[in-house]
Amino acid sequence: MPDAAAWVVAGPPGAGKSTVAGLLLAALRPPPALLDKDTMYGSFVAAALAAAGRTPGEREGAWYDEHIKAHEYAGMTATARQVRSHGCPVLLSAPFTQQIHDASRWQSWAAELGGGTVRLIWVRSDAATLHRRLTARGSGRDTAKLDGFTAFTASMRLDAEPAAPHHTIDNRLGAGATLEAQVSTLVRSLADG
């Protein structure tokens, strides 16, 4: 069976991962199965936070990482591995901050995803862009991020490129090219290379 690629679209919340994922899905043939963290787990996370007496916007921090995020990412990983094992490419969309900033962790995670071709697409952003985008989308899940914006942006490592091999899509205010142009160039370069 041919290698079913895994595409990982990562970056901070509000960076534009969903937009980039949509552009990739439109350009890739065959189109991969989309595994978006918010779509897969959004309502579950809201219910789990409520059941635990946590605030609805708590999507960062030690408690969330231990009791929620670990299970979200484990479920996404197992689902991706299973889908790929049947020859279907996948596209995972989530921040994946810890996985992309540690080269050995990335290698281990890529193996858990089923090995083979695992491509990281990093959506680059900065504090000004994130603040504008998070404010504009007005989602309750962003409340804690905006309330503790300085700590949130520090935890996202905005100025640190991923330690894992990656392709960058620049979605900062004033980026030199549109997302459409950047994704088109990326897909063309991978097809040629």
Walk through the language-model features, giving the residues of each:
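Conserved phosphate-donor/acceptor-positioning beta-strand/loop module used by diverse small-molecule
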Residues: 113-135
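Walker A/P-loop
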Residues: 18
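Small-molecule kinase domains that catalyze NTP-dependent phosphoryl transfer to phosphate-bearing small molecules
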Residues: 132-182, 190-193
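Conserved substrate/cofactor phosphate-moiety recognition/catalytic segment
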Residues: 22-74, 81
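Hydrophobic anchor at the beta1->P-loop junction of P-loop NTPases
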Residues: 9
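P-loop (Walker A) phosphate-binding loop of NTP-binding proteins
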Residues: 12
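Glycine-rich phosphate-binding loop used to anchor ATP phosphates in small-molecule kinases
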Residues: 64-114
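ATP-binding Walker
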Residues: 15
